[in-house]
Amino acid sequence: MDEKCRKRFDSYKKSLASLAEARERDMRDSFVLSGTSAKFSITFDLAWKVMKDILVQHYAIIDFVAGSPREVLRAAFRAKLIDEEIWMEMLKVRNQLAHDYDGQIVEKYCEDIVKVYIGRLEDFRDVAEAVLADAAQDDF
């Protein structure tokens, strides 16, 4: 994996660790809610970009039409990196959160973010680490 991709993956892991702190926070606090929303969106965006890096560099998948998150998620599912259904749901939530001007959307999805989505983001982190470790061994 090239340096740019490695840095993106490191940023993803740091962002995910920060997001995971939401599990210990009081979700009735509006500041915590808005922080969880922002951190989820950032972490999700880093995740699909890391997926794209892996697909291009380790699976030689380069036939993306637009390179959109939806397209990358579908390719990542076909490569068995993720479960497509939950990730499409997460994409939908991320898109809705971008237009959450009064905090109602994050209130609606906060429990899913904390109890389900963080776990899926952690699962992908583990899969990505395994793929990258295998690739590093192949380099030797």
Predicted regions: what they are:
Residues M1-F140:
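Solvent-exposed interaction patches of small proteins and small membrane subunits
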